[in-house]
């Protein structure tokens, strides 16, 4: 059996609503968004800036609708209003159909991009 690391969840064009360097760490994501793409509290996520060059990994936890908050040291790498991609991966020996959503200016879902497509 050979395991591959495959995309399972993606929040495309999320907007950071706050940065708090004094928090212990992690990213706070609206519960509605976590549910939409199958993310769990404590799950490892990758955060890639669309408007800058930062790329980090941290763990996610659920927050209020519309929230995308960067906490801890990672807050020094991002700014409120910055556009990011949040992704999570899973190990599998079978294909995974990733859950992908495109977000609008207020972190609302504007398009369900599942099934996976390279066409925006």
Predicted regions and their residues:
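Compact, glycine-rich, soluble single-domain proteins
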Residues: 6, 16-17, 21-94, 106
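Extreme N-terminal tail/first-helix region
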Residues: 1-7
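Helix-rich terminal scaffold detector
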Residues: 3, 62, 94, 99-120
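Eukaryotic proteins' extreme N-terminal regulatory segments
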Residues: 12-13
């Amino acid at each position: 059996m050979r395991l591959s690391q495959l995309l399972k969840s993606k929040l495309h064009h999320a907007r950071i609503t706050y940065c708090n360097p004094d928090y212990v760490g992690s990213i706070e994501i609206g519960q509605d968004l976590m549910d939409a793409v199958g993310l769990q509290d404590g799950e490892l996520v990758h955060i890639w800036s669309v408007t800058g060059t930062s790329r980090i990994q941290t763990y996610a936890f659920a927050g209020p609708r519309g929230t995308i908050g960067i906490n801890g040291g990672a807050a020094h790498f991002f700014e409120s209003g910055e556009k990011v991609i949040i992704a999570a991966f899973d190990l599998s020996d079978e294909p995974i159909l990733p859950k992908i959503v495109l977000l609008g200016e207020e972190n609302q879902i504007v398009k369900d991009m599942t099934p996976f497509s390279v066409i925006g």
